Amino acid sequence: MNKEQFLEKIKGGIIVSCQALPGEPLYSENGGVMPLMAKAAEQAGAVAIRANSVRDIKEIQKAVSLPIIGIIKKDYLPQKSFITATMKEIDELVATSCEVIALDCTLRERHDGLTINQFIKKIKEKYPTQLLMADCSNFKECENAYSAGVDFVGTTLSGYTEESKKQDEPDFELLEKLVEAKIPVIAEGRIHSPEQAQYVQKIGVDGMVIGGAITRPLEIASCFVQAVESVEKL
């Protein structure tokens, strides 16, 4: 699948993030949970899946026929980048044949000592046809990553780094700026409701990822519990 085909596939649709990390209720040492989430997403009309880890990606590929944005989350402390942070993770993801690989493209110090531009260059030299999505937190990072050779940028890390503004809703301002700059953008982060998804779509993004509002029942249930408990009893 090339860049144009992927963009056409996700246009006007929802990419569902199906992830669970150790310590979370839906995480299982034996696997088997995320492909069920992906199957439900496909039946609902999702156009693609975002998944973490080689195991989950392979299981999801067997369960659905949707393209996958693959990542591997691994800490390399004391550095803060943990989403597909080194070539080791890139190699492992390429071996799964996932359509897109997403990686941290912030300008923070990296574990491998490379700048993000050098890292992107090495990936493109090694895997020239592999589609890349840049997980970024602000416009400068997005602009830099796109000029360095990634295929799409994502607002995945907006609000989660020291270099971005903390907020409870999607970063509409950043999305608008990226669309205006004609940088292919996949909206991601804090899209909590269908109304917010509609607003994001109207901005003109190329695609959007929704995770917590769909595939994290702990967060969803907590939201309802807090709302009900905040109401004063008659």
UniProtKB/Swiss-Prot annotation:
Superkingdom classification of source: Bacteria
Record-level GO BP terms: carbohydrate metabolic process; N-acetylmannosamine catabolic process; N-acetylneuraminate catabolic process
Enzyme Commission identifier(s): 5.1.3.9
Record's GO cellular component terms: cytosol
Enzyme class: isomerase
Involved pathway(s): Amino-sugar metabolism; N-acetylneuraminate degradation; D-fructose 6-phosphate from N-acetylneuraminate: step 3/5
HAMAP family: ManNAc6P_epimer (MF_01235)
Protein's UniProt name: Putative N-acetylmannosamine-6-phosphate 2-epimerase
Source organism of this protein record: Lactococcus lactis subsp. cremoris (strain SK11)
Gene: nanE
